[in-house]
Amino acid sequence: MKRVKLIVAYDGTGYCGWQVQPNEITVEGVLNKHISELTGEDIKVIGASRTDSGVHALGNVAVFDTESRIPGEKMAKALNARLPEDIIIQDSKEVPLDYHPRFQDTRKTYEYTFYNARYDNPVTSRHHHFVYVPLDVEKMKEAASYFLGEHCFISMCSSKAQVTSLSLIHISEPTRLAL
């Protein structure tokens, strides 16, 4: 038995989040299906972090246990040949059996992108929140500063994760994407 660590990136637009849900298409469900088909085993991945419906991820960590003879380092290539184009395995490798992504990979980065213009951009609209009124970046920076530091989110977290430390907030002036 070995444990394989995956670094997963996905466009969550077409998924009902990460976690398996009855009668819904989820990222975890798609990974379980394709890894099971590849290995011939009933595979259940364990993810470091769950995302909500429609949320994208770059670098989400997951592991699974397998008896497969496919080396951990080759699993990314083998899976990418089978997965839909909106899910990519960026890297794969074998890790110790006691490695758990929820406890070893505890740092997360969230990015929220606002597209501020008179009209939305249909080419990139799945990856930003559209705001047509002018934004005051200085006021946004001032408001964001209140989130820095350590905060107790007991009402919104499991009993194991009640305190969160927020170390950096970066707000930048808008840029235009030339296509």
Predicted features, each with a name:
Residues I154-T164:
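Short catalytic/ligand-gating loop segments at beta-alpha or beta-beta junctions
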Residues I169-L179:
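Single conserved hydrophobic/aromatic residue that forms the stacking wall/gate
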Residues M1-K2, L166-L168:
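Short, flexible loop/turn motifs enriched in small residues
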Residues E150-F153, L177:
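A general structural signal for well-ordered secondary-structure junctions
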